[in-house]
Design a protein with these regions (language model features):
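Extracellular/periplasmic envelope-modification machinery, especially enzymes
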Residues: 1-171
Length: 171
């Protein structure tokens, strides 16, 4: 897994991806298309590490430190970026509170921890998006990305069907 301070980037890095490996699945294609259009991509993705402060997931307690480093990088940007955020949002219900030593616990592959309130995880995610916008960045949230075990067509169709009452019509 790549430390955010060693983030992969190319071109003008006017676009940034942030999130866990779900967001990372977008990097190859985005990078290719952006370079063809004279732009570039910086990837701040990290396995099992969505863009939320003070929480961690799976066996990645260092996620707390990863997000601090992401913020340090973001605060160093000299110009507005197009920031794409995505994650396996299912894991928000399995967030854990920060440990006392996230980097050491990460090296030890710690997987147990004190369960966080899912609403607090979502609040942190929302607050991060609001902060990015307040800094002047263009934020694009991609939700949801189907897992490899899901039928994407059925999943998206069910989402549209569930939203139908909120619209005058569906195209």
């Amino acid at each position: 897994m790549r430390d955010p301070y060693d983030a992969c980037s190319n071109g003008d890095s006017s676009w940034v991806t942030i999130g866990d490996s779900y967001a990372g699945t977008l990097d190859f294609y985005l990078s290719k298309v952006l370079l063809e259009k004279g732009h570039g991509l910086m990837s701040l993705t990290y396995e099992q590490c969505p863009f939320v402060n003070d929480f961690w997931f799976g066996n990645v307690p260092e996620c707390v430190e990863v997000n601090k480093r992401r913020w340090n990088i973001i605060k160093s940007f000299k110009e507005r970026k197009n920031i794409i955020i995505s994650a396996n949002y299912y894991f928000f219900r399995e967030g854990k509170l920060a440990t006392n030593n996230p980097l050491e616990d990460g090296r030890n592959n710690l997987s147990y921890g004190i369960r966080a309130n899912e609403d607090e995880v979502w609040h942190s995610f929302s607050k991060n998006i609001e902060t990015l916008q307040a800094l002047g960045h263009n934020v694009i949230v991609i939700y949801p990305i189907p897992s490899v075990t899901e039928d994407a067509k059925k999943m998206y169709l069910s989402l549209i069907t569930d939203l139908k009452p909120q619209f005058d019509g569906i195209i």
